[in-house]
């Protein structure tokens, strides 16, 4: 029987159970969960459950996985979470399995070395440099021009990203960043990966951080799979981001109607090659202005925003989580792009400290569904929302996916209207 090991698979509202459910479509498959917080219900869903240390403890988790896999070898590793890709790449190397190499996983996680590699390949990136104190940021801001961004070296899912618009904001912003780095589990995970795999990080993420110029232009991304070393892109997706607070996604529009999408996909393919990524999913965020495209970041995994599977299925007609499992096992994948419908995935969000008091029931949401509209929740009654700049902020409350025969922007209007009609109450605290 073929064994698929799922490593820290859950993210946000995507549960371990949902990821496992798709694997049930693969005949003769034994599914093993390796996670830091397995539940009793996991024992009923998975064929076997291994309890790992938290993801930031790569050293001990790696040692446990090595011992377990020596006794019960895996035929594939599902490495589609930020928490799992670094550790998983070490296991891919040791077990000679399909998946991202250690070097590629590192470049997709270490945003400093990622920018170095992209710049070397002639691909556009923001102006960037490492900093570790207020003096560095004042100097770099004078060089780059305001606004500038402060970012943790490792990908943090939009956490620890600070926009600085003026010189008098620098000192307080740097102080917050330095304090946050001391507590960051993402930083601990990167350092533990470096020590375990003998990987040179090119910097000290416990005290250094990125300072970047702020990229202007249309906000877009590409998502897809790298099969072997060949990228397959679902399409070019336009992002609509929040303004105050900035950087949170309000809508995804597929396809983008504001860009030369063929040229964008050419840049995306070159970016994947520069990362050396293979046999994995990818998500690449970009800015394009006056025909010039620059990379904001590259991730060597699936994007996990609520509704993403439904959004991309409009174009590919396939379930991407199942495809990622097939890819990990080296199975043939069905790859296609259907251009007959445009789509938009919109979110209703909460940007203040609050407690969810009232949300629609599943039956109420199902009653609103139509052939061209789907809705879902990203939270539950009693859940607490945090206000930015709290590093644990996650603002999505509900999502809506709408399709339209000719326009993703028209689909977005339909989705946003549906979201505003939902009866949701979040009390401020």
PLM regions and their residue ranges:
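ATP-binding N-terminal substructure of ATP-dependent carboxylate-amine bond-forming enzymes
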Residues: 1-104, 135, 385-386, 392, ...
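Peripheral (often C-terminal) accessory segments that flank ATP-dependent C-N-forming ligase machineries
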Residues: 5, 120, 325-429
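A short beta-strand motif that forms the metal-chelation/ATP-contact edge
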Residues: 89, 292-302
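Glycine-/Pro-rich loop/turn segments that contact NAD(P) or position catalytic residues
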Residues: 106-124, 133
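Conserved ATP-binding module of the ATP-grasp superfamily
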Residues: 124-126, 147-150, 167-216, 245-247, ...
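Short beta-strand-to-turn element immediately C-terminal to the catalytic PLP-Schiff-base lysine
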Residues: 131, 161-166, 225-227
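Short, well-ordered beta-strand elements within core beta-sheets of diverse protein domains
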Residues: 162, 212-213, 256, 396-405
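ATP-dependent carboxylate/phosphate-activation module, predominantly the ATP-grasp catalytic core
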Residues: 168, 174-177, 213-277, 281, ...
């Amino acid at each position: 029987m073929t064994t698929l090991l799922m490593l820290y698979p859950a993210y946000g509202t995507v549960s371990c159970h949902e990821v496992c459910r798709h694997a049930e479509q693969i005949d003769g498959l034994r599914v093993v969960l390796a996670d830091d917080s397995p539940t009793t219900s996991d024992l009923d869903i998975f064929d076997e459950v291994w309890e790992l240390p938290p993801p930031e403890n790569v050293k001990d988790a790696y040692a446990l996985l090595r011992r377990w896999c020596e006794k019960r070898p895996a035929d594939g590793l599902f490495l589609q979470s930020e928490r799992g890709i670094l550790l998983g790449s070490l296991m891919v190397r040791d077990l000679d399995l399909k998946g991202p190499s250690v070097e590629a996983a590192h470049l997709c996680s270490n945003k400093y070395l990622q920018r170095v590699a992209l710049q070397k390949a002639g691909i556009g990136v923001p102006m960037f440099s490492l900093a570790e104190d207020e003096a560095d940021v004042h100097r770099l801001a004078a060089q780059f021009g305001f606004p500038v961004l402060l970012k943790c070296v490792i990908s943090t899912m939009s956490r620890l990203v600070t926009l600085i618009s003026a010189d008098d904001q620098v000192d307080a912003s740097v102080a917050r960043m330095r304090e946050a780095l001391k507590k960051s589990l993402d930083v601990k995970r990167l350092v533990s990966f470096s020590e375990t795999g003998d990987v040179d990080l090119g910097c000290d993420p416990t005290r250094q951080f990125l300072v970047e110029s702020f990229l202007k232009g249309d906000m877009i991304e590409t998502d897809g799979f790298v099969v072997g070393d060949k990228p397959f892109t679902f399409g070019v997706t336009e992002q609509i981001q929040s303004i105050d607070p900035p950087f949170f996604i309000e809508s995804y529009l597929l396809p983008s109607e504001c860009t030369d999408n063929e040229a964008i996909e050419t840049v995306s393919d070159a970016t994947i090659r520069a990362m050396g990524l293979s046999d994995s999913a990818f998500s690449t965020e970009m800015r394009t202005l006056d025909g010039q495209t620059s990379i904001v970041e590259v991730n060597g995994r699936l994007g996990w925003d609520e509704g993403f599977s439904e959004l991309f299925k409009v174009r590919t007609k396939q379930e991407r989580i199942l495809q990622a499992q097939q890819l990990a096992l080296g199975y043939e994948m069905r790859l296609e792009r259907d251009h007959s419908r445009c789509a938009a995935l919109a979110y209703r969000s909460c940007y203040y400290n609050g407690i969810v008091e009232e949300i629609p029931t599943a039956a109420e949401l199902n009653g609103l569904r139509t052939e061209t509209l789907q809705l879902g929740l990203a939270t539950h009654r009693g859940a607490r929302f945090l206000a930015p700049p709290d590093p644990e902020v996650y603002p999505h409350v509900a999502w809506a996916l709408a399709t339209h025969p000719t326009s993703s922007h028209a689909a977005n209007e339909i989705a946003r209207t549906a979201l505003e009609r939902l009866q949701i109450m979040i009390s401020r605290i």
